Design a protein with these regions (language model features):
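N-terminal Rossmann-fold NAD(P) dinucleotide-binding loop
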Residues: 4-5
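Conserved dinucleotide-binding and phosphotransfer motif residues
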Residues: 14-16, 78, 110, 169
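Glycine-rich FAD pyrophosphate-binding loop
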Residues: 12-36
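An accessory alpha-helical subdomain
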Residues: 67-76, 86-110
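Predominantly flavin-linked oxidoreductase catalytic cores and closely associated redox partners
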Residues: 97-98, 102-180
């Protein structure tokens, strides 16, 4: 989804060799379903009341660093002009595919590699690295970003299959509800 693509772009821009391991046949399928296929990529209102969980204030530092204005500026920079309706920002094309396409192009431009139809079999810590075993080969990484969508949209790949790996590395999981 958008979070995984944005994280991969940020990782590559920070100088890391970055690979997306995607178990679906295409990266970013969930984006196509957002905003009824129009992809509202940000909102004018982003207060604490918009967030769920045990600690909604956890989001505050993130939005101080990359707020709504920076989000709009980022998307403009990569080719998405906004169309604003009722406080929601959509691409001017009103097509979610536009957002997916420019995110994938920006990821490729920054050096991100995509490996699709890649099922993760195991992730193990080996010293300073992680060994990621997949159906298409093994990968070593200093860091892993889990951007799985969990149960948001099983048809687009967000099916919860990464949850055991996330829990294995000590992350506390709160009650999960599907959401785009």
């Amino acid at each position: 989804g958008a979070s995984g693509l944005m994280a991969s772009i940020a990782s590559a821009l920070a100088g890391a060799d970055t690979i997306i391991l995607e178990h679906m046949d295409r990266v970013g399928k969930k984006i196509l379903a957002t905003g009824n296929g129009k992809c509202n990529y940000t909102n004018e209102v982003q207060g604490l009341s918009c967030y769920r969980g045990e600690n909604p204030a956890f989001a505050v530092p993130v939005f101080r660093q990359f707020d709504q204005k920076k989000t709009v500026a980022f998307f403009r920079e990569i080719g998405i002009e906004p169309k604003i309706k009722n406080g929601y920002y959509y691409p001017a094309s009103e097509q979610a595919a536009s957002v997916l396409d420019v995110l994938r192009m920006e990821a490729a431009y920054t050096g991100v590699k995509e490996i699709v139809s890649c099922e993760i079999k195991a992730i193990k810590r080996q010293g300073d690295f992680f060994l990621i075993r997949t159906g298409t080969g093994d990968f070593r990484a200093k860091s892993i970003i889990f951007a799985t969508g969990l149960f948001a949209s099983p048809k687009s790949g967000s099916d919860g299959s990464a949850l055991p790996y996330i829990e294995h590395f000590g992350h506390h999981i709160i009650d999960i509800v599907p959401a785009l």
